[in-house]
Design a protein with these regions (language model features):
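Conserved polymerase palm-domain catalytic core
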Residues: 2-175
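A conserved non-catalytic segment of reverse transcriptases
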Residues: 158-215
């Protein structure tokens, strides 16, 4: 599937490449759903994890309820996975696994309503995810919004929700940011370049570093 975060032999460059493959086609989708999950790692339902993660339930419960220490004070964890926990990325991936399948079942089916690999993706719905960052492509804004609602239902079962402010539908001609890169079409040509936010962060790091070394 097209999930690239915290997986062996996969990285952000692979996710960017998949976006390029999808968006550079001559009949590429024009609409993008930019997904943003509110505090994904902090709000995953413990009940859902204990019911669906295939591992020893007692060990998993101890890990989830271990809490964290900050300034010598113990803070309990009633939801989410411990920040910095060694298996937290795996649990997050397993929680979000299934979004792509849900979209395929809805948009990649044949006339009989069954998933068919030979069926042409007329809706141009594609899914790319890196950890809790994801984008969905679509042929129309209406299809993108339909995909948004399917994902919202999927996340709700797991104690998660989309940010309405940051989850937006964008036309490829206006461009969108994903994993530190900006994707936009100019005169039918796809241009991928570092996002303004990423460039600003790099410039800030350089300006902070050079004065210190000059002292």
């Amino acid at each position: 599937n097209h999930s690239y975060g915290f997986r062996k032999y996969r990285c952000t460059h692979d996710a960017i490449e998949q976006c390029y493959i999808v968006l550079s086609r001559s009949v590429a989708p024009e609409w993008i759903l930019e997904g943003d999950i509110k505090g994904c790692f902090d709000h995953i339902s413990h009940d859902w994890l204990l019911a669906h993660i295939p591992m020893d339930k007692n060990i998993l419960k101890q890990f989830l309820k271990a809490g964290f220490i900050y300034q010598r004070e113990l803070f309990p964890t009633e939801e989410g996975t411990p920040q910095g926990g060694i298996i937290s990325p795996i649990l997050a991936n397993m929680t979000l696994d299934g979004i792509e399948k849900k979209l395929v079942e809805r948009f990649h089916t044949n006339a009989l309503g069954k998933v068919d690999s030979r069926f042409k993706n007329a809706h141009k719905v594609n899914f790319v995810r890196y950890a809790d960052d994801f984008v969905v492509t679509a042929a129309t804004p209406e299809l993108a919004l339909e995909a948004k609602e399917l994902i919202r239902e999927f996340l709700a079962e797991r104690g998660l929700e989309l940010s309405d402010e940051k989850t937006v539908v964008t036309n490829i001609d206006d461009g969108f940011d994903f994993l530190g890169w900006n994707f936009r079409k100019y005169n039918e040509k796809l241009i991928i370049k570092p996002s303004k936010k990423a460039v600003k962060a790099i410039v800030s790091n350089i300006s902070d570093t050079i004065p210190r070394r000059g002292k």
